[in-house]
């Protein structure tokens, strides 16, 4: 199976320019290709992972990746299928984000070894020195307004309004392709399916300005089986930065993927062979309640993004929480697992009984409710039920002398720190 056939089999090809010419280019030898990442935040997220891992697959097949971080285009903002104008960021902010994103990309692509080692580029290196007049003369003249207006990403914004800044974005991305072709011989661009208009602006510029052919592959924007945009948890992006989305949170995200999506996501997000995935799928279908596909998916992706140790910690936390065995976890583990849970700080020598504690920490709304909660068995300290109204916290309730977890009911957790 060729690399192009494998990408198709994994569901990683949404659209291409001339497929026959593209297949021939892959057959004739190593292809230099690039994928662009605009710094719109200080971290990439799961939505970016499809293109990143596709780049890695191509590198493993012998092709040469260029990872372009948009230090210049990030200052402008891509309008593609956005309902409103992006907020412009300062140059200093974008520079900081560029640096962080470059660090993240180095986890997935090999920048050190072999003739096809990856190369990191920043489009500010060429846009930073070009004058407005030169850009209009040397690039702008190759694009008609009619051509630019025909892009679906622009059409969707015409009625609500689009600034010239964002309107010109497609020319900037097109010039990236031209520049990388001229400097490094890059002939293929890979990106999300929402980028088709911007990417083909690059092939158009190559054709008209340099009389050369370029290729484009778009990867699909991933949705779950209900059509919901993939990569968000509770409405928030699942980030690749462990300080923004912990490995435990990422593990839980994959573990909770719907049954109908799990095997498909194994093809897209893991490096297991298609034969292995087929076998996992068969076993999974025989006992879906055991969630084998989700467990394998969580293992493979968390290990890939954060490493084996982080994966093992996530599994350990999950198992102990499920068993209600909170005292088997360290304070560090609990802080990871309960990230975002309401926290109440008390003095280490504060001797509040359970009723006062529940009210002061706003766990129960009143002393009357607090008494009822305790008497009804709704209060748990570190996973153990407390029904004594005179119960007072002791040192044995302080995990690592740092933290106590109080649960009200089945799901409402609260953290006490000292």
Swiss-Prot record:
<keyword id="KW-0067">ATP-binding</keyword>
<dbReference type="GO" id="GO:0006437">
    <property type="term" value="P:tyrosyl-tRNA aminoacylation"/>
</dbReference>
<comment type="similarity">
    <text>Belongs to the class-I aminoacyl-tRNA synthetase family. TyrS type 1 subfamily.</text>
</comment>
<comment type="function">
    <text>Catalyzes the attachment of tyrosine to tRNA(Tyr) in a two-step reaction: tyrosine is first activated by ATP to form Tyr-AMP and then transferred to the acceptor end of tRNA(Tyr).</text>
</comment>
<dbReference type="GO" id="GO:0004831">
    <property type="term" value="F:tyrosine-tRNA ligase activity"/>
</dbReference>
<keyword id="KW-0030">Aminoacyl-tRNA synthetase</keyword>
<feature type="binding site">
    <location>
        <position position="169"/>
    </location>
    <ligand>
        <name>L-tyrosine</name>
    </ligand>
</feature>
<keyword id="KW-0436">Ligase</keyword>
<feature type="short sequence motif" description="'HIGH' region">
    <location>
        <begin position="39"/>
        <end position="48"/>
    </location>
</feature>
<dbReference type="InterPro" id="IPR002307">
    <property type="entry name" value="Tyr-tRNA-ligase"/>
</dbReference>
<dbReference type="Pfam" id="PF00579">
    <property type="entry name" value="tRNA-synt_1b"/>
</dbReference>
<keyword id="KW-0547">Nucleotide-binding</keyword>
<dbReference type="InterPro" id="IPR036986">
    <property type="entry name" value="S4_RNA-bd_sf"/>
</dbReference>
<feature type="binding site">
    <location>
        <position position="173"/>
    </location>
    <ligand>
        <name>L-tyrosine</name>
    </ligand>
</feature>
<dbReference type="InterPro" id="IPR002942">
    <property type="entry name" value="S4_RNA-bd"/>
</dbReference>
<keyword id="KW-0963">Cytoplasm</keyword>
<dbReference type="InterPro" id="IPR054608">
    <property type="entry name" value="SYY-like_C"/>
</dbReference>
<feature type="short sequence motif" description="'KMSKS' region">
    <location>
        <begin position="229"/>
        <end position="233"/>
    </location>
</feature>
<feature type="binding site">
    <location>
        <position position="232"/>
    </location>
    <ligand>
        <name>ATP</name>
    </ligand>
</feature>
<keyword id="KW-0648">Protein biosynthesis</keyword>
<comment type="subunit">
    <text>Homodimer.</text>
</comment>
<keyword id="KW-0694">RNA-binding</keyword>
<dbReference type="InterPro" id="IPR014729">
    <property type="entry name" value="Rossmann-like_a/b/a_fold"/>
</dbReference>
<dbReference type="InterPro" id="IPR002305">
    <property type="entry name" value="aa-tRNA-synth_Ic"/>
</dbReference>
<protein>
    <recommendedName>
        <fullName>Tyrosine--tRNA ligase 1</fullName>
        <ecNumber>6.1.1.1</ecNumber>
    </recommendedName>
</protein>
<dbReference type="Pfam" id="PF22421">
    <property type="entry name" value="SYY_C-terminal"/>
</dbReference>
<dbReference type="InterPro" id="IPR024088">
    <property type="entry name" value="Tyr-tRNA-ligase_bac-type"/>
</dbReference>
<dbReference type="GO" id="GO:0005829">
    <property type="term" value="C:cytosol"/>
</dbReference>
<dbReference type="GO" id="GO:0005524">
    <property type="term" value="F:ATP binding"/>
</dbReference>
<feature type="domain" description="S4 RNA-binding">
    <location>
        <begin position="352"/>
        <end position="418"/>
    </location>
</feature>
<dbReference type="GO" id="GO:0003723">
    <property type="term" value="F:RNA binding"/>
</dbReference>
<dbReference type="InterPro" id="IPR001412">
    <property type="entry name" value="aa-tRNA-synth_I_CS"/>
</dbReference>
<feature type="binding site">
    <location>
        <position position="34"/>
    </location>
    <ligand>
        <name>L-tyrosine</name>
    </ligand>
</feature>
<dbReference type="InterPro" id="IPR024107">
    <property type="entry name" value="Tyr-tRNA-ligase_bac_1"/>
</dbReference>
């Amino acid at each position: 199976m060729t690399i192009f056939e494998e990408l198709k089999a994994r569901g990683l090809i949404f659209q291409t320019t001339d497929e026959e010419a593209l297949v021939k280019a892959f057959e004739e030898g190593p292809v230099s290709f690039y994928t662009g990442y605009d710094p719109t935040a200080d971290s990439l997220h799961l939505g970016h992972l499809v293109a990143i891992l596709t780049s890695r697959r191509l590198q493993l097949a012998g092709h040469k990746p260029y990872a372009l971080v948009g230090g210049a285009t990030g200052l402008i903002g891509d309008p593609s299928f956005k309902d409103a104008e992006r907020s412009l960021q300062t140059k200093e902010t974008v520079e900081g984000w560029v640096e962080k994103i470059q660090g993240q990309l180095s986890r997935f692509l090999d920048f050190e070894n072999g003739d096809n080692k990856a190369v990191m580029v920043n489009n500010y290196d060429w846009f930073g020195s070009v004058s407005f007049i030169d850009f209009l003369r040397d690039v702008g003249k190759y694009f008609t307004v009619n051509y630019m207006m025909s892009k679906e990403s622009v059409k969707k914004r015409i009625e609500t309004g689009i600034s010239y800044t964002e309107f010109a974005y497609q020319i900037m991305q097109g010039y990236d392709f031209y520049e990388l072709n001229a400097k490094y011989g890059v002939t293929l661009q890979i990106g999300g399916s929402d980028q088709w208009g911007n990417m083909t602006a690059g092939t158009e510029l190559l054709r008209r300005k340099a009389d050369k052919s370029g290729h484009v592959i778009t990867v699909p924007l991933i949705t779950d089986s209900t059509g919901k945009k993939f990569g968000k948890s509770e409405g928030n992006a699942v980030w690749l930065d462990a300080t923004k989305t912990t490995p435990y949170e990422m593990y839980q995200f994959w573990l909770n993927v719907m049954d109908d999506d799990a095997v498909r996501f194994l093809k897209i997000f893991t490096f297991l062979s298609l034969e292995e995935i087929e076998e996992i799928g068969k076993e999974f279908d025989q006992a879906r309640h055991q969630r084998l596909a989700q467990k394998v998916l969580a293992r493979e992706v968390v290990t890939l993004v954060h490493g084996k140790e982080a994966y093992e910690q996530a599994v350990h936390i999950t198992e102990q929480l499920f068993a209600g065995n909170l005292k088997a976890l360290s304070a560090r583990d609990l802080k990871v697992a309960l990230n975002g849970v309401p926290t109440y700080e008390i003095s280490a020598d504060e001797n509040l009984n359970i009723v006062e504690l529940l009210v002061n920490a706003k766990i129960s709304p009143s002393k009357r409710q607090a008494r009822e909660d305790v008497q009804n068995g709704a209060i748990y300290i570190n996973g153990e039920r407390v029904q004594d109204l005179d119960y007072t916290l002791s040192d044995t309730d302080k995990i690592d002398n740092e933290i106590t977890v109080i649960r009200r009911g089945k799901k409402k957790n609260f953290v006490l720190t000292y």
